[in-house]
Amino acid sequence: MRAAGIDDLTAKQKIIVELYDKFFRKAFPKMTERLGIVYTPVEVVDFIIQSVNDVLQQEFGQTLGSKGVHIIDPFTGTGTFITRLLQSGLISKDELAYKFKNEIHANEIVLLAYYIAAINIEQVFHNIMGGDYVPFEGICLTDTFALYEKDDLVSEVLADNSTRRRKQKKLDIRVIVGNPPFLGAKLLRRGLGNDYVETL
């Protein structure tokens, strides 16, 4: 797969997801199974985001762009849910800078995916808004399952990440989008155990 010359936003996200998915399955098959790493097709991501926005409008009289509606992808992978949210047009350009800075959040436990997601999300935001490059402060390198259970294991090494993590724990998050690691949950139910057992 070659990314050069691809201008379609959906196609770019598909390439990122597929390349990362193939790489991870080949390079780290045990980690892929243990953490339940599964990547969601872009079309499914778009459907979920649109559906969430519809429910917000119908049931709560708000949208994904409404001020005060914090959004999180707790298992962000390469950031597909957040990038597609930014690209969806469901958050107007007038609302986007504020949302990006204050009310959009993402967590990832795998270091490589965390860095890819941060770059991916920042680049998509920059492509939409232009101007100076703005870092995505809403992403945390953390295990969402253990966010409230464990002390921050990397606080001394990644001080900024620890600050974002503490801040996120205080938020009133209203919307969760994403694809949780179902394989990890299946392993727990079968009693095979993994890193999450001690936090349950």
Each model region followed by its residue ranges:
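SAM-dependent methyltransferase catalytic region
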Residues: R2-L200
